């Protein structure tokens, strides 16, 4: 799977004392330290075989004395468009993103099966041509189709094997995609979690990401106009 990434620029107000920034592996991270939690985030554009997204890598550290449940379903995002409108973007939960992947993979398998079926369907058939001449010299060509049942059986077996192989590859692909994608998690005191989510991409100026934790919303604004 090919992935293309494009980094973004964080927008900060001068009097915001809750934010610290640093570069990690070439990406700009912003951390908000407030209400007993440190929430870090970086975002960038990505493009893979399944579409174009804003990807957010999220870090959450619980500095409270009690456990808190982090629910990715509560993460929201909106975009200030070039026309000045606020547009609500879809933040994919793990379940929604896996469903999108499965749908794309089912289409790929269906198209692959169709093309394999065409090849298998024509297997076993061969064509021969014979030419004869009448008494006045006119040529007549006879076309004869031959069918080899064993060749057709072998081709269908090969087609089925190709589909099974592709299906197994996609199962492994899904397992890889699920690693690190944020899910509902209990964050215990002094524990931290890190993962990522994808947001449906749309062109605009400012991307705002809101991460609610324990009744407080941690917001981050990113310049995505470039």
Where are the regions a protein language model picked out?
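Sec/Tat signal peptide C-region and signal peptidase I cleavage site
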Residues: 3-7
């Amino acid at each position: 799977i090919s992935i293309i990434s494009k980094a973004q620029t964080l927008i900060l107000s001068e009097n915001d004392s809750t934010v610290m920034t640093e570069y990690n592996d070439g990406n700009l991270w912003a951390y908000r330290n407030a209400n007993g939690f440190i929430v870090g985030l970086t975002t960038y554009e990505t493009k893979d075989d399944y579409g174009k997204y804003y990807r957010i890598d999220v870090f959450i550290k619980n500095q409270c004395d009690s456990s808190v449940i982090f629910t990715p379903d509560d993460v929201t995002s909106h975009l200030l468009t070039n026309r000045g409108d606020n547009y609500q973007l879809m933040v994919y939960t793990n379940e929604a993103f896996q469903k999108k992947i499965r749908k794309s993979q089912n289409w790929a398998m269906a198209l692959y099966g169709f093309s394999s079926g065409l090849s298998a369907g024509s297997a076993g058939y061969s064509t021969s041509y014979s030419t004869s001449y009448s008494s006045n010299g006119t040529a007549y060509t006879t076309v004869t189709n031959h069918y080899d049942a064993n060749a057709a059986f072998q081709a269908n077996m090969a087609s089925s094997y190709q589909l099974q192989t592709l299906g197994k590859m996609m199962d492994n692909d899904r397992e890889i995609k699920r690693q690190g994608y944020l899910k509902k998690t209990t964050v215990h005191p002094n524990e931290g979690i890190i993962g990522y989510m994808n947001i449906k991409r749309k062109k605009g100026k400012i991307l705002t990401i809101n991460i609610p934790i324990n009744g407080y919303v941690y917001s981050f604004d990113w310049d995505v106009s470039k």
